[in-house]
Curated annotation (Swiss-Prot):
Late-budding domains (L domains) are short sequence motifs essential for viral particle budding. They recruit proteins of the host ESCRT machinery (Endosomal Sorting Complex Required for Transport) or ESCRT-associated proteins. p6-gag contains two L domains: a PTAP/PSAP motif, which interacts with the UEV domain of TSG101 and a LYPX(n)L motif which interacts with PDCD6IP/AIP1. The gene is gag. Keywords: AIDS, Capsid protein, Host cell membrane, Host cytoplasm, Host endosome, Host membrane, Host nucleus, Host-virus interaction, Lipoprotein, Membrane, Metal-binding, Methylation, Myristate, Phosphoprotein, Repeat, RNA-binding, Viral budding, Viral budding via the host ESCRT complexes, Viral nucleoprotein, Viral release from host cell, Virion, Zinc, Zinc-finger. This is Gag polyprotein. It comes from Human immunodeficiency virus type 1 group M subtype A (isolate MAL) (HIV-1). Gag-Pol polyprotein: Specific enzymatic cleavages by the viral protease yield mature proteins. The modification Phosphoserine is found at S154. PROSITE patterns: ZF_CCHC.
Length: 505
């Protein structure tokens, strides 16, 4: 064990025992880890003596690095231990195993970049040496004998084009994909790319019609010169030659490599892209004017839909810029539109997306609701004050001095004698009879009797009094009393109807 533990000594051993096994952990490296690493190296048939130097640790890491992805946890632990030991040998200050691995990866990346730069320099030198004999204008290249030859489009490129059509159909991103895959292609290569499209034959027929129209325009603008063709010169291409239907591959190569060149491949490619634009427009029937942000749609998703539809629009770049500046703000939802208008017309797309981030979320809804409730409360209070329905706080009034702002028990004025309501002495205000009458003109509550809004007595049904024709009759005292009662209560008796009651006599 002593021989195995003698890998480090002195200051290196102190530095080794200060390194933690894990970031933020309590355990640190000890001599037992070196002993374990030596035994593992012997088990894997590696020389444990390599641990004594930094170069030896580097060799061990190169051997173990290829097995890290498929190796066991013991191999990974051994690699981490050797990497940490390498940092100790190289005097690289690290605090834990993860930091040591990061340092090792950084060193390896720098070494790899230097190797790549050296290889690139060698390739550039070789290309410069052979540039006089070989042309790299793919797919038309010049061989060592100085002849211009054609290299067909690779099956991988054709397969990528077919997958794009199958997955994307004719969405706007198909056009830049076609442009990238057909870079430098001849008309024959372009026709091959169009012929391998199995489905979407209606779209292919539309594309053929567009190509025929453009070929006819080319023939109209570039008429054939009269007379024979001078010897050594090639004939001028017609529209059908550019489309690759009446020209051979050698003629196409000759036009593209002549001096001055006639880029029949680029011209044909431009016609195809024009037809693809029409097809994309047909497969994307949604107009840019119909792209509107939903009430709960995030602004980022709305911008994605907007620009995806904008790519399918057949318009110049100036018109598309105007659509972006105008319609993007105009078709946003009310919340985002308020924010975008506050930014001003010169705001960039990044500023717009940053300002509208989070619009429609819970926090934004809560803030908008709070503002709306605050505005509603303020407007209601203003309306009540305008109508005169708003009553301020009722101020208290002192019954002693008659002033407002304090109660009678807190009044500093001399104590008023008697009732505080009528000013008379002998009773208090609670017993004062001079109170405000109710709507019937009665003082309520009364001490006796029924309430003022009830009848105080029930009248009995009566008849009119009988007429008296007693000439010179003597009136008895009882008759006088009855006559007096009749005068006071004319309806309180029925004697006028039934005469003298026998029971009452």
């Amino acid at each position: 064990m002593g021989a195995r533990a003698s890998v480090l000594s002195g200051g290196k051993l102190d530095a080794w025992e200060k390194i933690r096994l894990r970031p933020g952990g309590k355990k640190k490296y000890r001599l037992k880890h070196l002993v374990w690493a030596s035994r593992e190296l012997e088990r894997f048939a590696l020389n444990p003596g390599l641990l004594e130097t930094g170069e030896g640790c580097q060799q061990i890491m190169e051997q173990l690095q290829s097995t890290l992805k498929t190796g066991s946890e013991e191999i990974k632990s051994l690699y981490n231990t050797v990497a940490t030991l390498y940092c100790v040998h190289q005097r690289i200050d690290v605090k834990d195993t993860k930091e040591a691995l990061d340092k090792i990866e950084e060193i390896q990346n720098k070494s790899r970049q230097k190797t790549q730069q050296a290889a690139a320099a060698q390739q550039a030198a070789a290309a410069t040496k052979n540039s006089s004999s070989v042309s790299q204008n793919y797919p038309i290249v010049q061989n060592a004998q100085g002849q211009m030859i054609h290299q067909a489009i690779s099956p991988r490129t054709l397969n990528a084009w077919v997958k794009v059509i199958e997955e994307k159909a004719f969405s706007p991103e198909v056009i830049p994909m076609f442009s990238a895959l057909s870079e430098g292609a001849t008309p024959q290569d372009l026709n091959m790319m169009l012929n391998i499209v199995g489905g979407h034959q209606a779209a292919m027929q539309m594309l053929k019609d567009t190509i025929n129209e453009e070929a006819a325009d080319w023939d109209r603008v570039h008429p054939v010169h009269a007379g024979p063709i001078p010897p050594g010169q090639m004939r001028e291409p017609r529209g059908s030659d550019i489309a690759g239907t009446t020209s051979t591959l050698q003629e196409q190569i000759g036009w593209m490599t002549s001096n001055p060149p006639i880029p029949v491949g680029d011209i044909y490619k431009r016609w195809i892209i024009l037809g693809l634009n029409k097809i994309v427009r047909m497969y994307s029937p949604v107009s840019i004017l119909d792209i509107r942000q939903g009430p709960k749609e995030p602004f980022r998703d709305y911008v994605d839909r907007f620009f995806k539809t904008l790519r399918a629009e057949q318009a110049t770049q100036e018109v598309k810029n105007w659509m972006t500046e105008t319609l993007l703000v105009q078709n946003a939802n009310p919340d985002c539109k308020t924010i975008l208008k506050a930014l001003g017309p010169g705001a960039t797309l990044e500023e717009m997306m940053t300002a509208c981030q989070g619009v429609g979320g819970p926090s934004h809804k809560a803030r908008v609701l709070a503002e709306a409730m605050s505005q509603a409360t303020n407007s209601t209070a203003a309306i009540m004050m305008q109508r005169g329905n708003f009553k301020g706080q009722k101020r208290i009034k002192c019954f002693n001095c008659g002033k407002e702002g304090h109660l009678a028990r807190n009044c500093r004025a001399p104590r008023k004698k008697g009732c505080w309501k009528c000013g008379k002495e002998g009773h208090q205000m609670k017993d004062c009879t001079e109170r405000q009458a109710n709507f019937l003109g009665k003082i309520w509550p009364s001490h006796k009797g029924r309430p003022g809004n009830f009848l105080q007595s029930r009248p009995e049904p009566t008849a009119p009094p009988a007429e008296s024709f007693g000439f010179g009759e003597e009136i008895k005292p009882s008759q006088k009393q009855e006559q007096k009662d009749k005068e006071l209560y004319p309806l309180a008796s029925l004697k006028s109807l039934f005469g003298n009651d026998q029971l009452s006599q």
